[in-house]
Every structure is written in structure tokens, then in C-alpha cells.
Amino acid sequence: LEDEFSYSTKTGNLNYFDPGLLVTKNPEHKLNILWLVAESWRADMITPEIMPNTFAFANEQQWFENHYSGGNGTRMGLFTQFYGLYGHYWFDVLRNRRAPLLIEQLRAQDYQFKAITSSAFTYPEFDKTIFSSLEPEYLQEFNEGHGWERDQKNTGDLISFIEDKEREEQPFFAFMFFESAHANYYFPDEDIIESHYIEDFNYLTVDIEESMPQIKSRYTNATHHLDRQLARVYKVLEEKNLMDNTIVVLTGDHGEEFMENGRWGHNSTFSQQQIRVPMIVHIPGMEKKKRTDSSSHIDMPATILNALGLNMQAGQHSFGQDMFAPDYKHDYLVVSDWHGNTVITPEVKIIFSVKGAAYQASSTTIDDQPINLGDEKSDYQTALSEYLLEQNRFFN
């Protein structure tokens, strides 16, 4: 798979960031960071019916309603939000065991760390990438039982960590990856809000197309369970007055498709359902606002570093921008999978894919309808030219 990228993108000689970029001067007021990521979390799940607690929480924060993951799978979806790099950098970052600038900067600022997952840190290899510079005791995996059972236990552990640290002057960075919404979409009886769900869900015997509405009902119920676990976190943040000194990031790794464009699941196409995810950000002192401009996972490092008062030039370490900057605007976004990158403009998606020795390029409208780029009237050429010039900026 690594070789496939070499057909269309440069690899090797990674020049990610100069250690001299690290800011050693301490900001006057250090903020905690709570970073919550949910597996397979579609952007359209935050409704009063499905996720009432998160709907209420989002309406009091910065809610980016047109947000895109940096990938259609977990690996690229998490990689892009911590590094601010396109997915084809994954292989070199993994080979070089390079932690992201964001984590290195927090280490330089003497943060306390806790990273919890209801999946595993070893696959994808986040223990060798995102969290590679953290001591093993800061990483907690619990993956016994169904996803909802893991999330219940891990949410309790996350809350215990927060409560233990909230009285200390030393700031903390806490991360949790939730697994409730992952297929087969398991949930306890108390989270059934759609009763017409498929009970005997066997990949080998189920008629996927015929049963898709009932399969999606399982997903809806599982997402409702996710909401109840998140509500436990919102409650402790309020009760401990942590909203005044804690940055909160709430997002998904990628979306989930239910045959809207002929596929089920994720990591197969760049359909809106597979790449659109929630993005809710709380910055202490910032007024609530719903934002409809396009935003991306690659913006997160620049956004959080600036919110911490470190004010680093984003172009020196990522492809992203500070989402709260007055001039924030993307002419195009990039979303990645194993096989290549997709350039997304407001009107079209241009997919560059390499599978084996076969190089493929295709295009669709923003709503995933096939098109001939030769007939396209919008100015996608400018965005495409800029992407081709910029994509290898962090390789020597």
C-alpha cells in the first residue's frame, strides 16, 4: 500500500517541522484540552431526537456544520486532525516515529496526559505516530465486550482522570476514542429509540440492501448511546467549572454510509456520508456560533495552538488554518484514503487513486454525481493547480 502512494506523491525525506518551532515561553494562563473523537460519527446525527444532550451542548459552542474529516477511515481521520497534513504523509510519519507538533508543544509546556481508547492504539498505529512520544502508562486501552460497554467503562475512567486533575495547577490533555457507533452498532435496551431495527445482524446471511433501513436504525440507537456517554462528560465539565479553563474538541474520525450512494460503511468512497463529520469546539471566552463555511480536520493543530496563545505560523507545520482567524477560508479541501487524495472544491470532487500499478482519476459533483470535468463551468482548475504545487510541501 505504501508503494501505491509513490506513483502520485513524493515520499521519503520527511521535513515535517523544525524543533526550533517549539515555543518554550509559558502562556500566562494555560488551558486544559479535552479531545473527544467518536467512531463512524455522521454529521447529521446531532438532532434533538437522536443526540439531545450533544445537540444542546453544540448549540452553546462553536458548531461547524459543514465540516469534513481528513479521511474516510479511522487512520487518516485521526492522523489529519492531529498533524494537519494530508494522508499521504502517514507512511513517512510512521516510518520516522514522528509525534505531531501539537503533542510535542504540550509536552514542552509540561502538560499532564491521558489517552483512552475503546479500540486499540496499535491498529491503526497511533502508538507509533500521534502518541509516540508519550510514556506507555499514559495510554489506556479497554476493548472487551461490545463498543457501548467499552465506552461506558472508559467514560468513567476519563471522568475520574478529569476529577483528579481539576484542582491541580498543571494543565492536562485528555483524549478519548468512542466505539459505540462502530458496526455492528450494538447498544443496550435503554437506548432503543428506533424499534424497527434488525436484531439478527449477520454479515454472511443478511440481505444488505433489503435490510439497510433496519441496519441504520441499529446505528441510530448506538449513536443515542454515544450521546448518553458524552452527556456524562458534559456534566462533569459544568459541575467542576472546567468550561472556564478547558478547550473541548468534539468530532468524528469519519462518517458512515447506508447505501445513499450504493455503499455501506466507510473507507470505500468519498461520498458526503463517509467524509462529513461533526465538529464542535469550545474555547473559553468565545461566544457561541453556528458556522456554515467549509472546515477540515487539517485545521485543528493551527486552531488549537493559536487558542493556547502560542501563535505559530500554520504554514510552517501544516496545511491547515486557524478556524477562528478573520480571514479563514478554504478554496479547496483534501480528504485521503489508503490509495490517494481527493480534492474538494465547493462544486466538485476530484479523486486521485492508485491501486496496484493502475493510476485512476475520476470526478463527481459535491453531492457525488458523476461528471465530466471538461463540461464543468466552475473554476476548479485554480484549486487543483494549487493543490498539485502544495501537496509535497513537507518533503525535502
Language-model features, listed with the residues they occupy:
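Active-site-proximal alpha/beta segments of enzymes that process anionic O-linked groups
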Residues: 1-202, 320
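Histidine-centered active-site microenvironments of extracellular/periplasmic hydrolases
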Residues: 238-285
